[in-house]
Curated annotation (Swiss-Prot):
Pfam family for this entry, one: APOC4
Biological process according to GO: lipid transport; positive regulation of triglyceride storage; triglyceride homeostasis
Source organism of the structure: Acinonyx jubatus (Cheetah)
Main location: secreted
Function: May participate in lipoprotein metabolism.
Family: Belongs to the apolipoprotein C4 family.
Location of the protein in the cell: Secreted
Superkingdom of this protein's organism: Eukaryota
Key words, A-Z: Lipid transport, Secreted, Signal, Transport
Protein's recorded name: Apolipoprotein C-IV
Lineage, uppermost ranks: Eukaryota, Metazoa, Chordata, Craniata, Vertebrata
Region forming the signal peptide: 1-27
Amino acid sequence: MLVPGRRPQALPSLCFCILVLACVVACQQEVPAATPSMPPELVDSPWSLMKDKVKTLVTRTREKWQWFWGPEAFQGFVQAYYEDHLKDLRLRTQAWLRSSRDSLLNKAHSLCPQLLCRDGDKN
């Protein structure tokens, strides 16, 4: 089957994308909404203690990194980036344009035959 207006090479990629999308939708429908509870035989096992420790670790890590996701951290990053890279951009750009122009004029003058370009024609 060819899709009108599409190349035949794109068809396998399209089929793969549709297959992946169908699998994702099917998997989402099979997952129950409630979180399953632990079986009674595992409640007193070392695995339940591990679950509590992991939950505590995740909570502490989330609290410690909360500053990173706040607006102050992003504003500080943007300010530091501006000061390090963009503050003197206008001056650097002007200097680069001047040096590029001078270099280009020098190259053009060196390629010019002596009969056509005299010393008075440099400007």
